[in-house]
């Protein structure tokens, strides 16, 4: 049995996995299968070339995709898609971050909430970045998404700190 990830590793991984472009890429491949070679822009036309490059590079660095005959998910990528589904189910059940949101917004907000150090405190919380109040009941039920992320980290090693820092630096520069 593996131990739970260290808090900083958990927070870093939640932050890396909460990239909207990465969420879109992983769920697109999970839902619709391999993206053909040079088909990424056609598949996700609302993302800029920079966003597409960033998502593909991050997915490669984290070992989520392989490029054999197009872009497809590795075992790690498939299991991450399940983590995203779990996060979205929790968000939908608790109307988080709001009643009408997209899948990406729900997953991102849930991962940001999980990655915040305040969530471990058993009281009503305000998510600083989004300014949302989360009920005690909702926080207590975060065990499903939290366990899913912890399990993914245990199997696949989480997010490499140097890769995460490089991607955050590139994102801020853009």
Question: What is each PLM-predicted segment?
Answer:
Residues 67-90:
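Basic, amphipathic "hinge/linker" alpha-helix immediately C-terminal to the N-terminal HTH DNA-binding motif
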Residues 2-26:
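Short alpha-helical segments that sit at the start of domains
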Residues 85-173:
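Amphipathic alpha-helical dimerization/coiled-coil segments
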Residues 1-6, 56, 68:
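Recognition helices and adjacent regulatory flanks at domain boundaries
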Residues 32-44:
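Short acidic, hydrophobic short linear motifs in intrinsically disordered regions
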Residues 46-61:
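Short amphipathic alpha-helical interaction segments
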